[in-house]
């Protein structure tokens, strides 16, 4: 019988094997308009570097907000809370966002309601969706995306 540590290590190895080719440069080679290609462009526009590996959070950020501004980062957390994703990290980011951007509370609440209206997607394996058109993914899960805003450079 596997111990919990062995199970975690097995899942980690599987994840590493599945994501080893998900650099921004490899992702932009996906067909035009697909989630994979748009994710690669998102990572390059955000100045994350050519060899950065895409992660689940990057895909969610792209699907929901299309940008990585501080306000949109916080709005994504509210969206995911509305979609049923809970966690201390998420709640901490939301509290910080409300304290730092109190004038955006109505926007955050709107995003929360959009998350409630969407089908549950926060725990979907996005690796299997990279070849699909991004608009189709959004339509399938009823994701109401924000219009893309200018991306901020990493570390700014």
What is each PLM-predicted segment?
Residues 141, 145-156:
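A cross-kingdom marker for long, charged
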């Amino acid at each position: 019988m596997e111990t919990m540590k062995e199970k975690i290590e097995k899942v980690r190895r599987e994840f590493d094997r599945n994501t080893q080719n998900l650099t921004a440069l490899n992702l932009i080679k996906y067909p035009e308009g697909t989630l994979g290609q748009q994710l690669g462009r998102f990572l390059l526009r955000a100045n994350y570097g050519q060899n950065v590996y895409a992660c689940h959070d990057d895909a969610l950020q792209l699907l929901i907000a299309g940008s990585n501004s501080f306000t949109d980062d916080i709005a994504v957390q509210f969206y995911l809370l509305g979609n049923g994703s809970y966690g201390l990290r998420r709640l901490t980011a939301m509290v910080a966002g409300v304290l730092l951007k109190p004038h955006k509370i109505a926007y955050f609440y709107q995003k929360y309601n959009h998350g409630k209206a969407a089908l549950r997607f926060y725990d979907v394996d996005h690796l299997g969706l990279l070849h699909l058109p991004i608009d189709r993914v959004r339509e399938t899960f009823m994701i109401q995306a924000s219009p893309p805003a200018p991306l901020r450079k990493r570390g700014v």
